[in-house]
Curated annotation (Swiss-Prot):
Species annotation: Amycolatopsis methanolica
Cross-referenced SUPFAM superfamilies: GroES-like, NAD(P)-binding Rossmann-fold domains
Protein name: S-(hydroxymethyl)mycothiol dehydrogenase
Keywords: Metal-binding, NAD, Oxidoreductase, Zinc
EC number(s) per entry: 1.1.1.306
Cofactor note: Binds 2 Zn(2+) ions per subunit.
Cross-referenced Gene3D superfamilies: Medium-chain alcohol dehydrogenases, catalytic domain, NAD(P)-binding Rossmann-like Domain
Similarity section: Belongs to the zinc-containing alcohol dehydrogenase family.
Oligomeric and partner information: Homotrimer.
Residues in coiled coil: none
Top class in the EC scheme: oxidoreductase
C-alpha cells in the first residue's frame, strides 16, 4: 500500500479536505494510476452535496489523465508507463446490453474491487469509481484508455466526463451530419462540447442559446455560428427565425430543466431530434399536450456519457485534437493545484470557467 494526498468530501455540503489516503497495491484486473491532471466537474460538486448517494466519505475527482504505475495479476490491456485517460465505462462484455451490441448501455461496468481508505481504515467511495483528485488512484484496468502521449494531459483528461458527454451527444446520440442545423441550449462546458461536436460532424448552422453573454462568447469560439440570448428573446422563435421558419434538425438541451426541454422540443424542425444531456433533478416534472408529440414526429433521446465507448472514441478524438480539428484546449480556463478544489467549485458554480484543471 501507498499513502498519498487526496481530496475528500467527508460529509454532506461540508467543504472538501486535502488529506492522506491509502492506495492498496493492485489486485487482479486492477491498476494503480499516477495522476497528471484532473478537471473539476459539476458531478464532483453533486457528490459533495449528497446528490448522488450518501456513501460518505467520497474521494472526489474523475476527469483525469495520467500514466499507469503498476498493474495487478491478469492485466494485459495496459502496462506500466502507458499514457491513459481514465473512464467510468469499463464495459463488462457479458450483460444483456453488451451481448446485444450496445455496450454503451452496459449496466455491469467494472471498477476496482479493493477499497482505498483514509489512514484510519475508513473506506472511501471514489467518485464515478475513479477518485482522481489524488496523487494516485486505484481503478479497474478497463477504466484506463490509452491515447497518444503527445496530447497535453490537461486537455486529454477532459474526455473522461463532461467534454465527452457533450461531443457524444452531438456525434453519437444526436447523429448530427453534414449540412444539419443544430441548436444547443445551455453553453457551459458540456454545451460547448456539443457545439464542438456539431462543428466536427459538419453542421452548417450551430445556434448557441444561453442567458449569459460571456458563455455565448465562449460558444462562438468553439464553433457556434449564431447566438441567442435567452434573457432578451423567445428562444423558440429565435431558432425558427434562424432556420427559415422551420426549426433546427437537432436540438440539444444541455441544461436539463422542464422549461429548457420544452424549448428544445418546440425549436426543432418537424421530425427533428431532441437530445437531453443536461441532468434533471428527481423532482422535475413535465406537462405537455400528448398530441404535440404525436403530430411532430422525430426522435426524443437522452444521452448518458455521450453514448461513448471509451476505447473506440477517446483515441480518435485525441487524434482529431492533435490534427487541429477539435479545439479541446479552449475548455481549459485555468490550471490549479490540488488544494484549490474547494475554491474551484465556487468559480464553477458562478459560471466563471469552462474547466478548472488540477495539474500535478
Amino acid at each position: 500500500p501507498q499513502t498519498v494526498r487526496g481530496v475528500i468530501a467527508r460529509s454532506k455540503g461540508a467543504p472538501v479536505e486535502l488529506t492522506d489516503i491509502v492506495i492498496p497495491d493492485p489486485g487482479p484486473s486492477e491498476v494503480t494510476a499516477l495522476i497528471a491532471t484532473c478537471a473539476v466537474c459539476h458531478t464532483d460538486l453533486t457528490y459533495r452535496e449528497g446528490g448522488i448517494n450518501d456513501e460518505f466519505p467520497f474521494l472526489l475527482g474523475h476527469e483525469a489523465a495520467g500514466t499507469v504505475e503498476s498493474v495487478g495479476e491478469g492485466v494485459d490491456s495496459v502496462q506500466p508507463g502507458d499514457y491513459v485517460v481514465l473512464n467510468w465505462r469499463a464495459v463488462c462484455g457479458q450483460c444483456r446490453a453488451c451481448k446485444r451490441g450496445r455496450p454503451q448501455y452496459c449496466f455491469s461496468t467494472f471498477n476496482a474491487t479493493q477499497k482505498m481508505t483514509l489512514t484510519d481504515g475508513t473506506e472511501l467511495t471514489p467518485a464515478l469509481g475513479i477518485g482522481a483528485f489524488a496523487d494516485k488512484t486505484l481503478v479497474h484496468a478497463g477504466q484506463c484508455t490509452k491515447v497518444d502521449p503527445a496530447a497535453d494531459p490537461a486537455v486529454a483528461g477532459l474526455l473522461g466526463c463532461g467534454v465527452m458527454a457533450g461531443l457524444g451527444a452531438a456525434v453519437n446520440t444526436g447523429a448530427v451530419s453534414r449540412g444539419d442545423s443544430v441548436a444547443v441550449i445551455g453553453c457551459g462546458a458540456v454545451g460547448d462540447a456539443v457545439i464542438a461536436g456539431a462543428r466536427l460532424a459538419g453542421a452548417n448552422k450551430i445556434i448557441a442559446v444561453d442567458r449569459d453573454a460571456k458563455k455565448l462568447e465562449w460558444a462562438t469560439e468553439l464553433g457556434a455560428t449564431h447566438t441567442v440570448n435567452a434573457t432578451e428573446t423567445d428562444v423558440v422563435e429565435a431558432v425558427q427565425a434562424l432556420t427559415g421558419g422551420f426549426g433546427a434538425d437537432v436540438v440539444i438541451d444541455a441544461v436539463g430543466r422542464p422549461e429548457t426541454w420544452k424549448q428544445a422540443f418546440y425549436a426543432r424542425d418537424l421530425a427533428g431530434t431532441v437530445v437531453l444531456v443536461g441532468v434533471p433533478t428527481p423532482d422535475m416534472r413535465l406537462e405537455m399536450p400528448l398530441l404535440d408529440f404525436f403530430s411532430r414526429g422525430g426522435a426524443l433521446k437522452s444521452s448518458w456519457y455521450g453514448d461513448c465507448l471509451p476505447e473506440r472514441d477517446f483515441p480518435v478524438l485525441i487524434d482529431l485534437h492533435l490534427q487541429g480539428r477539435l479545439p479541446l484546449d479552449k475548455f481549459v480556463t485555468e490550471r490549479i493545484s490540488l488544494d484549490d478544489v474547494e475554491k474551484a467549485f465556487h468559480t464553477m458554480h458562478a459560471g466563471e470557467v469552462l474547466r478548472s484543471v488540477v495539474v500535478w
